[in-house]
Amino acid sequence: MKYSGFSQPLDRFAVGLAACSARRASLRWAVVIGLFSLLLPAAAPLAMAGRFPSSGWVATWTASPQASEPGLIPDLNNQTVRLIVHTTIGGNQLRIRLSNAYGTQPLLIGDAHVAVSASPFIPTIVPGTDQALTFGGQSAITIPVGAVILSDPVNFSVTPLTDLAVSLYLPNDTPNATLTEHYYSLQVFYISPTGDYAGSNAFPDTLPFYSWCLLSSVEVTPAWPTSTVVALGDSITDGVGSTQTLNDRWPDLLAARLYNRFNFFAPSVVNQGIIGNRLLNDITGQNALARFDRDVLSQAGVRCVIIQEGLNDVATAVVIPNEAVTASQIIWALTQLIQRGHDQGLTVIGVTLGPFAGSFFYSAAGETERQAVNQFIRTGHLYDSVLDFDQVLRDPSNPTQLLPAYDSGDHVHPNDAGYQAIADSIDLTKFLFFGLPR
């Protein structure tokens, strides 16, 4: 047995104790895996190709950072923001990541707290759940331009599939132009009047906004070893067309199905979708090739990535002709992401491009490109597995269009029923072994 991380050799007693503990742990896991293997079909072990996290930290919620959008969030000065986020798995310890990735000046956080949200519809926390967060033991931290920082771990009981309130006090003048944001939250966040309300049970006279800012991840140490599945995608992953505040994006619904089926064996499923995102060109947020390392590989506990990208590369050629790309270019970009994921030991799952006939962005040429890309995704044999969103969402009588019952109205994005159909179509056993050690 190899030991590392010690400045001096372990004595014989310590080595013997460690070896004995390791044998007991191995036996326990062997029994658990053996029992679950009896319950699963032969296809399930594909998920075991991915790596297992060594740090113990797993992301339970994420949002992909974007540069500020004028007018989306007002300029802030001596105010507190309270962000409501929905967990996927639970844990006994918690830490957060704050991002100044697109900031134009150092960002001072004067106070930071986490609590259980009383309701996603109001800026009130459950009494007795508030916990102050620190950074190197200090309540305040200045985040350099372009940097991402972690809070100190705190003992905090996180329940799966619940809402947390993360409150950040910004004592200095913080213009909108320097805020790192996530445009499309589908969840209200709250801005206080003047003052530090980070630890307050409720906000007086709050202003609600539908986006997130500064917070890019909430991470936990689960009671049972598990890992993270990252959904990388565009507006269909970001949840456009679903109902605000209900957490009806397909990654949310997949996470709920996994937890309800496997409980603490379930991995987390975190959402790194960006509305309008493309593979090869920026539009809202960095292109997927540029953000893959930050938004996938850097996530705590990542072991699997689901790639739902490419439709905007096809569709936006109608409105941005000079950025038109071919199916071959899209396939090349997807192949790059697959290779980069595999190089880091991740299981990589592909998603077919859904129907979009009848939409503002539709063209016959775009449909030809979509079909060619889907042919590659289904039959290229580069992905470890494929989720066929196209087959789930299309109208059998007109396969280039969304099934009317699943159409949010724009003929591109599903509604709540469509997102539920996507989640229900996914074979959960593909993901079970991400919740077990190898």
Task: List the predicted regions and their residue ranges.
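Structural recognition of the beta-strand scaffold that forms the well-ordered cores
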Residues: 95, 228-233, 237, 267-273, ...
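N-terminal secretory targeting modules
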Residues: 5, 34-35, 46-232, 242-244, ...
